[in-house]
Amino acid sequence: SRKFDFVIIGGGIIGINVAIELKRNYFDATVCIIEKECHLGEHASGRNSGVIHAGFYYDEDSIKAKFCKDGNFALREYCKQKNITINECGKVVVAKNHEELESLDVLLQRGKKNNVDLIEIDEHQLSEIEPSAKTFQRAIYSPNTATVSPTKLISSIKEDADNLGIK
């Protein structure tokens, strides 16, 4: 039987990163990831849309808002270091009717309170950013929302784990 100091259940992006942080903090420890799929990251992490969220959907001062904003920065830095392409596509949030304008206002306020760069745009500006999108009167543009290939990201993070001796 094999013995490990730490065993992580689940080899998705979170599990791999938890294993890496444990190994970095306890360098002499043995760390193992147990994954039900044949390879790490083959379940949800490898099949998601790869969105790097900006952090304006969450309430001010919430842990989710902090992690989202900090994670956006950290993931961008990691991708830059590893030469992983980031698709700087931005994101638009539109309103279908007058009632949904109130929801846009809530998101704008959350973004402001969370120190997230959001731009209120009109219908003409929206058509310049995304010609196929339609909105009622105005919309929100989030320039710091982006996407990254989940498979390339997982592959790179797995390589980091391998280099640290994680099993």
Predicted segments — roles?
Residues G50-Q125, I129, F136:
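Dinucleotide-binding Rossmann-like beta1-alpha1 core, especially the glycine-rich loop
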Residues R2-I14, C32:
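Beta1/beta-strand and adjacent pyrophosphate-binding region of the FAD-binding site
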Residues A19, K23, D160:
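Gly/Ala-rich phosphate-binding loop of Rossmann-like dinucleotide-binding domains
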Residues I140-K167:
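Helical element adjacent to the flavin cofactor pocket in flavoenzyme catalytic cores
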Residues E37, N72-L75, A161:
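Short amphipathic alpha-helical/adjacent loop interface patches that line ligand
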Residues K23-R47:
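Glycine-rich FAD pyrophosphate-binding loop
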Residues I16-I20, S155:
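Short, hydrophobic alpha-helix immediately C-terminal to the catalytic nucleophile
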Residues G12, E37, G55:
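Proline-glycine-enriched beta-turn/loop adjacent to the NAD(P) cofactor-binding site
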